[in-house]
Amino acid sequence: MPEHHKIDYVEFSSPNPDATRSFFASAFGWQFEVFEDYLAFHGAGLDGGIYRSDQVGRVGSGGPLVVFYSLDIAASERLVCRHGATIVKPCFSFPGGRRFHFIEPAGNEFAIWSDR
């Protein structure tokens, strides 16, 4: 149930929504509803959508960073690479854990972190 003033839904852009959908469906098992010029996703921990745009989300240009949690960060890194992602910031330590950043096939930047 939605909670007052809590993040309820997230949307991000993609110049190639089909490539973004294929990546997240195959790598993480997300489910999608396809609409004209819009994809709604479920099964990601937070529901959201992908809309067509020439813009992509990158940390270097001030975009928000969506960070996934992993029980096995090395396995997650291999998984995203196997499904076409590019590692743009190799795994590094920070207080509380480790993380890496990757670009999915359509160009958006994400990260995966672990406390293990």
List the predicted regions and their residue ranges.
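N-terminal beta-strand motif that seeds the catalytic metal site of vicinal oxygen chelate
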Residues: 1-19, 47, 64-66, 116
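Vicinal oxygen chelate
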Residues: 1-3, 12, 26, 33, ...
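Residue-level detection of beta-strand scaffold positions
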Residues: 9, 20, 38-41, 65, ...
